[in-house]
């Protein structure tokens, strides 16, 4: 066991250690310059890209929420407007219905009044025509009676015949 430390100490060369240490430092410097800086740059770019994408996604999410809210408001307004339009249309329809009914009633009354007036006029014309016929028949009967100078029974018979004849001619 006493020989072990001597063997270890004898095998170590300080020049080799320093050379390996310098080579390692040069290798680390080269790796840092040519590999680590570009790798860190790429990682930084990737980090910036991901950050921008997250920021963009958040902005788009905010915009989408804003648009969704605007659409909800517009939909609510459209529903209210359509409800108002429907109510107005119902009111206008009811008003027009009442106006049409009122106009029909007025027209009906006008037609009734016109028909009554026409009936009265035709009745008066018929009565006037009947009076003319009665008058002409009376004159005719009187002239016939005078012409014949009949007795009372013959006159009565003649009047009845003419009245019967006048009734049939109507």
From Swiss-Prot:
Q: Which CDD domains match?
A: ATP-synt_Fo_b
Annotated membrane topology is: Single-pass membrane protein
Keyword presence, Ribonucleoprotein: no
Coiled-coil spans are: none
Q: What is its main location?
A: membrane
Residues passing through the membrane, by range? 11-31
Q: Which UniProt keywords apply?
A: ATP synthesis, Cell membrane, CF(0), Hydrogen ion transport, Ion transport, Membrane, Transmembrane, Transmembrane helix, Transport
Location(s) in or outside the cell: Cell membrane
HAMAP family per UniProt: ATP_synth_b_bprime
Cite the record's note on assembly: F-type ATPases have 2 components, F(1) - the catalytic core - and F(0) - the membrane proton channel. F(1) has five subunits: alpha(3), beta(3), gamma(1), delta(1), epsilon(1). F(0) has three main subunits: a(1), b(2) and c(10-14). The alpha and beta chains form an alternating ring which encloses part of the gamma chain. F(1) is attached to F(0) by a central stalk formed by the gamma and epsilon chains, while a peripheral stalk is formed by the delta and b chains.
Q: Indicate the family of this protein.
A: Belongs to the ATPase B chain family.
Protein's job: F(1)F(0) ATP synthase produces ATP from ADP in the presence of a proton or sodium gradient. F-type ATPases consist of two structural domains, F(1) containing the extramembraneous catalytic core and F(0) containing the membrane proton channel, linked together by a central stalk and a peripheral stalk. During catalysis, ATP synthesis in the catalytic domain of F(1) is coupled via a rotary mechanism of the central stalk subunits to proton translocation.
What this protein is called in its record is: ATP synthase subunit b
Q: Which organism is it from?
A: Bacillus pumilus (strain SAFR-032)
What gene is this protein translated from? atpF
